[in-house]
């Protein structure tokens, strides 16, 4: 095992004691920390994804273990994005598209990690800017209306060239990694997670001619809404977008880094998670 692999940070999302997963997470935290020690790793715990962090600890870590579901992984990836550190998910919860292993497979994963038998996947991330405020998104950036009623007009530009006006509930700008998240629920296309592209998917557009659009990641995009709107990052953070204020989006110079088992197959994951090829009775 390389010395640089010896320290693992552990992310756990705070869970209310009335949440059905609370006791399971509490037991899992203790078990994971003990397992890391038994396998020869140093570790430290980060409870919460609210931005409070010890930069020295994050710099010290080789990677971050995210205990929970995809939401925990997304929060951890955004927090550590500028540090260029990989994360891996240990699933406790539901779907888990991003997770590397189940809890009962963690020991084998750590043993493979010590022997450098784990693959590093690098995915496109988004960098957004509103005024002087910059942020990263792992799955998607959503421009959403603030009011329950009415239509939100969004003017879209490639560089400085206008190319479309969306009129509806909003617009999703997704990464390939995020194409199986909110984008998929909004009837956007699934794009291979390692592709270099953006997916623009309108939300309940007024025009029946509007369809999702896939653009190469070499483009810089910007958007303006005709009235105040919300910008939602990975379903976890929000920013205000004033009327006619530009939102700039481009490919982040730093990739999203996920550690996965060598045996992981993207198409097999899609088949299992989306129940492709299953009979209707099994899907229920």
From Swiss-Prot:
It holds the Pfam family NAD_kinase. GO terms for biological process: NAD metabolic process; NADP biosynthetic process. Belongs to the NAD kinase family. It comes from the Bacteria. Keywords: ATP-binding, Cytoplasm, Kinase, NAD, NADP, Nucleotide-binding, Transferase. It is an enzyme of class 2 (transferase). The active site is at residue 70. GO terms for cellular component: cytoplasm. Gene3D superfamilies: Probable inorganic polyphosphate/atp-NAD kinase, domain 1, Probable inorganic polyphosphate/atp-NAD kinase, domain 2. GO terms for molecular function: ATP binding; metal ion binding; NAD binding; NAD+ kinase activity. Its cofactor is a divalent metal cation. NAD(+) binds at residues 70-71, 139-140, 167, 169, 177, 180-185, 236. Involved in the regulation of the intracellular balance of NAD and NADP, and is a key enzyme in the biosynthesis of NADP. Catalyzes specifically the phosphorylation on 2'-hydroxyl of the adenosine moiety of NAD to yield NADP. It comes from Helicobacter pylori (strain Shi470). Its EC number is 2.7.1.23. It is found in: Cytoplasm. The gene is nadK. InterPro entries: ATP-NAD_kinase_N (IPR017438), ATP-NAD_kinase_PpnK-typ_C (IPR017437), NAD/diacylglycerol_kinase_sf (IPR016064), NADK (IPR002504). It catalyses: NAD(+) + ATP = ADP + NADP(+) + H(+). This is NAD kinase.
